Amino acid sequence: MATNTSTLNSTETVLKTENLNVYYGKFLALQNIWLDIPKNKVTAFIGPSGCGKSTLLRCYNRLNDLIESFRAEGKVFYYGKNLYAQDIDPVEVRRRIGMVFQRPNPFSKSIYDNIAYGAKINGFKGNMDELVERSLRQAALWDEVKDKLRQSGLSLSGGQQQRLCIARAIAVQPEIILMDEPCSALDPISTLRVEELIHELKEQYTIVIVTHNMQQAARVSDMTAFFNVRPTETGGRIGYLVEYDATESIFNNPKQEDTRDYVSGRFG
């Protein structure tokens, strides 16, 4: 049984997961997930490979829907509305809940158009120049690119490209930003810039980050969820939530032995 202790009782819940089971065909990938994501906090998902961290992350903006064999049972609420209800438009979900992927993936467009494109297709009618500048400033990239906005986004360094992708996500004015190992392809200096940016962004956004780097989780997050995986008799692997608590508690005083073993490096 997972320990799910909310130490942020005064904080509004943005996402609420209730008894979520995720299948790919007949294969059960995630089992019995109960988890509340607090507003304007950074929540980290940690755990060994194959435990379902990224699968759960993609449930929040329904990216898993693009996988034909995907099926979800249970409920995921966004401000009390079930994201998997029949009347919910997945495209609108993805506008409100943005995504930054493991490897930087800027469009093969100019830096300016990387930011403007999503806003245009979402019907933005305001001052586009101001939106582009504001988004790049929020992503701590404006000063580095303000004189080359018409150059290709692909001309930037890896760290700059990832911040461009964060700016692109910000431009469509989401409420939540999901980050799937956003620093795994970056050098240490670029990683530090992104971590500093995460601290700044949580003033305006709710952030959920998947990371294999436990030191990173300890540095950037307010809450941490530890997932583990158990083998089945048929050779499958089922991910499950072991413990969810304030990050300080997870790393300094975990309640579950498996959590203690993982954060101390005994397995994983």
Curated annotation (Swiss-Prot):
Keyword Cell membrane part of the UniProt annotation: yes
Single GO MF descriptor: ATP binding
EC identifiers of the protein: 7.3.2.1
Subcellular location as annotated: Cell inner membrane
SMART domains (UniProt xref): AAA
Keyword Cell membrane included in the entry's annotation: yes
CDD domains: ABC_PstB_phosphate_transporter
Keywords from the UniProt entry: ATP-binding, Cell inner membrane, Cell membrane, Membrane, Nucleotide-binding, Phosphate transport, Translocase, Transport
BP-aspect Gene Ontology terms: phosphate ion transmembrane transport
The protein's enzyme class: translocase
Record text on subunit structure and interactions: The complex is composed of two ATP-binding proteins (PstB), two transmembrane proteins (PstC and PstA) and a solute-binding protein (PstS).
Family: Belongs to the ABC transporter superfamily. Phosphate importer (TC 3.A.1.7) family.
Summary of the function given for this chain in its UniProt record: Part of the ABC transporter complex PstSACB involved in phosphate import. Responsible for energy coupling to the transport system.
NCBIfam families: 3a0107s01c2
Record-given protein name: Phosphate import ATP-binding protein PstB 3
Native species: Trichormus variabilis (strain ATCC 29413 / PCC 7937) (Anabaena variabilis)
